[in-house]
């Protein structure tokens, strides 16, 4: 997925057998590997209410995702589907409907089914870029990936391809 979206994903089926947390996971290495793979389209929808922002992302079955680092604890709801997700250092299988409070930090998940996942953040801000500045921290790997994608897109002369 390219752009200002929160979630990165690529097609790959992990081995969920046994204790997948036996070896420490290096998030930076995982993210760098994920960004080198073909990206999966994960649509994001923005919902606003009085004092609340809700960010809904759609994850296709078979995709792996890694979210940006959240600066604060926040509410999450799995609206549809089934995910294997890292919660409090353990892989949990969650199935919709499922609500929990996510601690500050990053989420890693594997979509076992087509899924719809929502982060809920307390804010009156309605500018998504400003909301991201307030609530998430993007890694250097992602910022470099995003910059390179924008550079490649801007270098394409569409008139040549028409």
Across the structure, where does each feature detected by a protein language model lie?
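Structural motif
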Residues: 75, 82, 106-108, 114-116
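A short, N-terminal "cap"/entry segment at the start of jelly-roll beta-barrel domains
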Residues: 1-56, 88, 145-162
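Double-stranded beta-helix
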Residues: 112-162
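Short acidic-glycine-tyrosine-enriched beta hairpin
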Residues: 84-108
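Conserved short histidine dyad/triad with adjacent acidic residue
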Residues: 53-70
